[in-house]
Curated annotation (Swiss-Prot):
Alphabetized UniProt keyword annotations: Cell shape, Cell wall biogenesis/degradation, Isomerase, Peptidoglycan synthesis
GO molecular function: glutamate racemase activity
UniProt protein name: Glutamate racemase
HAMAP family per record: Glu_racemase
Described function: Provides the (R)-glutamate required for cell wall biosynthesis.
Reaction(s) the record says it catalyses: L-glutamate = D-glutamate
Enzyme Commission number(s) from the entry: 5.1.1.3
Natural source organism: Buchnera aphidicola subsp. Schizaphis graminum (strain Sg)
Amino acid sequence: MLIIDSGIGGLSILDNIKKKFPHINYIYMLDNEAFPYGKKKEKFLIERSIKIINAIKKIYPIKMVIIACNTASTISLPTLKKTFSIPIIGVLPVFKPAIKITKNKIIGLIATRSTINSLYIKKTIYKYSLENTIKIIATNELAVIAEKKVRKLSISNIKLKKIFQSWIILSIKPDTIILGCTHFSFLKKEIQQIFHKPINFIDPGDTIVNKIEKYFYQKKIKKNILLCSKYNKQIKQLVFFLKKYKFKKIQEINLN
């Protein structure tokens, strides 16, 4: 199984997969050279995803790919499914669980600007906003804050409050928040503290397991591997955090 993201966000997806399937082996492609995907153009994301999959397929017997980034999934998934014969699974903002859980019918969606502006998300918001109020925050900065947190660097509570200010000032705030970026899962505690009230978080990682379960019998990779597009200081800062994922090897892969 190959998991692709530009940063550590996809590791939140991997956490959910490991809970259900603790003995699986995986390759995690941390495309840090192109971080963050949320700021990249559609053409770049499609071409980059194809390049990554082709490069890794030449080295390892991958049988399934998870695009563990909401932005890349909303943009590149249709093309990738046409290009490759192996299963390609994307991570998309999940609305149905939010509709079932919300008590006040006010749902928050926070995602990158590219995800919010995608046709898929616009159609989905229109569909579910007929009976619910959906409040939207488009931000690329929150992914950067999540990266800082896992590297044990200081993060600004003032910046977090500024990002969520449009919701904080509401007299009736969202009681359910859809996390539209895999990075945001690492900031649940900080987001919860900002609102001073219980929040239902809808995490894309909670639903990904059901999508991939039927493919695990094809597993052939014998150890866990982390590939990065550039081995640098930021990757070295992640080494301690990555220990729990039991990667046997961390190496740079040439995509040029």
